[in-house]
Amino acid sequence: AGVLQPDDVNQARTDLPAHVFQELYEAMPTVDTGNPFGDEHIQACTLDTEQAWSSWDGDGEPIAWGWDLAKSVDWTVGIGLDEHGTVCRLRRFQHPWMQTIDVVRRETANVSALVDSTGVGDPVLEALQQPWRDGDVTYLGRNFEGVKFSSSSKQQMFEGLAVAIQQQAIQFPPGAITSELEQFEFLYTRTGTRYAAPDGAHDDCVDSLALAVSRWRHPPQRWGAV
C-alpha cells in the first residue's frame, strides 16, 4: 500500500503538464517565473508560415472547432483543428451578436465545436443550437456544445492544452496565437496555482485553442446536415 506503480507514474507523465508532474512526482517545486506552456515547446509547435492575426486558412479541413465569444472589449475567436492537430482555420473578429452567430454557423457548418457559454455566451449558444438553413441544406445545430468556465474548469482545460503543446501534438501559425501563449504566466492564489494572461492582456486565442484541443481529443458523435 502507498507504493506507486511504474504504469501509474508513466500515465501521469503523459496526462500532466511537465511542471505539475515534476512537482507531484519528483518533489521539484514550481518555479516562480516562466511560462506554463514552455517557451521552447511553443516554438517547437509553431508552423513555418506567415503570421496570422485575424483570418487565416491552412491546408487541412477542420474536424474540431473551439469558439471563445467576445466579452466587452475582447475578440471572438474561432480555431479549427484538422485530423493531425494542426490549426487550419483562425477567425478573430469583433461583430454585433447577430453577425457573430451567422459567422460562427457558416464557418463551423456541421463540424463538432465547443463554445464558451459563460455569461453572455449562453444566449448565443442557444441560438447556435437551433436549426438553420444554408440554401437547400438544413443544419441541426447539435454539433455545438457549451462549456461554462469556472476558475477550476478553465485551469483544467489550460493544463490539457499545456500537455498537447509539450508533447508537440498540435501545431499553430505564428501571430495572435503564439503572442498570447508566450505572455501567459503562473498566477498564485490562496486556492492554488493557475495559468493566466497578464492584467489587461487578451487570452481569447488561448481560450479558443484550449477548447478546440479538448474537442479534438474527445470527439463526440458528429451531427450532420439534413
Language model features: what each stretch is:
Residues 25, 161, 208:
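A residue-level signal for conserved active-site and pocket-lining positions in enzyme catalytic cores
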Residues 60, 71-77:
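Short, flexible loop/turn motifs enriched in small residues
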Residues 189-201:
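Short, solvent-exposed helix-loop connector elements
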